[in-house]
Amino acid sequence: MRERVVITGMGVVSALGIGAEANLSALLRGESGVRTVRYLPTEHREFPVGEVPMSGEELRERLALPSGVYSRTHLLGVLALREALEQSKVLQQSGLALISGTTVGGMDVTEHYFPEPQPTGRDIHDCGASTNEIADYFDCFDYTMTSSTACSSAMNALIMGKLLIESGERDIVVAGGSEALSLFHLNGFKSLMILDTQRCRPFDQTRAGLNLGEGAA
């Protein structure tokens, strides 16, 4: 018999704001988080994007992390996960499972150092590193897994979390995804010529492409 699966906590960070309640309120007001690029160091500012309205330094300070090198994917993920754990009231427990979806992980850090590589290596660049860093912040996970299947990464993480609970392998699973905008994203989709210079209009006769965004949930 399959175990029953219920959701006990949610955390959301997006271009609409920080927190599930803030995001819901913004959606109900009909707001859009798509606007001119502010934080991504790109020359292609003609393409509007959905950026989380905080710089990397502001995110670090909000999480009370010491000075250091942190990928934006890591920071967004921690912020969303903290809200979910606080809602579910399992923050003081141990032995939890974390399954996080991401496409490029800490690519923003890779791009920062690419012009002048550093002699000392950092385990921050592969997509699974951000999952481990998110887990390390809370020190309550003994099982981590990364799903990296492009746009379906976080959805596959949710599916895997559900299966782990239904099978009885895990009692509590935290599942979702985190992704930060990078030059890799913007340049890649620009090369495909599918980015819109205005807010996208997917069901309109004048549709001209998509807008990229970032966030965690």
Model-inferred region functions:
Residues C151:
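Glycine-rich, Trp-frequent "lid" loop and neighboring beta-strands that shape
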Residues M160:
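Internal active-site segments that recognize and position negatively charged phosphoryl groups
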